[in-house]
Amino acid sequence: MPSLRARFVNRLLRTTTKPVWRPGLDIAEVRRHTARMEARLVRGPLSIATEAVSLDGIPATWFGGPEREHTGTLLYLHGGAWCLHLPKIYARFAAILSHLTGMRVLLPEYRLAPEHPFPAGVDDCLAAYRWLLDRGYRERPFALAGDSAGGSLSLVTMMRARDAMLPLPDCAVLLSPSTDLTMSAPSARYNAQLDPMFSPAAQDLLPNVYCPGQDRRNPLLSPLFGNWNGLPPLL
């Protein structure tokens, strides 16, 4: 049974966000809409130390104080359908994650479509992962997490890291990850009306924005079709 808070959020998304994803929509319009919604929902300063950092040119933010005060590191890849970033919402979420887990959270701002289509964001996420490895963060507890598009990018990052013989995280947490851009499973259609956020129009549009002309069965786009052998424990 969904909690009262979950039911409220689902209704809010169904009435404010889902109608925006319609045929012929403009990504700039969606960004303006989500920015207005974010401004209404998130107010007040964060009650946690933050630090802006460049990951070899990729902007990112640390959430949490000095490394010595934390039990480990969490690399979080934000969602947003590969074309949106809600910095205030994800800053708040990263702060909560740091507080609850005792880990220092790194939130990179990977490049977004349509200005930077696939594989730009995929490459940025692996670069952020390598940046942490190069600085020894894997020597302590180390986790990877992401939601929606960020969940997909988390899976892809681990698959690429494994194939490159890089150390893998201790575990990964995937929140509603997008794993199949082909939408070939029957449930993708018959559950479309139940989805509180994305309409069938969005499911058809977003791959054309993110990866135009690409084979959607490519595991870097649809990790469902990739090799999951050797990945760390997933939640």
Please state what every model-predicted region is:
Residues 50-52, 56-235:
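Alpha/beta-hydrolase superfamily serine-hydrolase fold, recognizing
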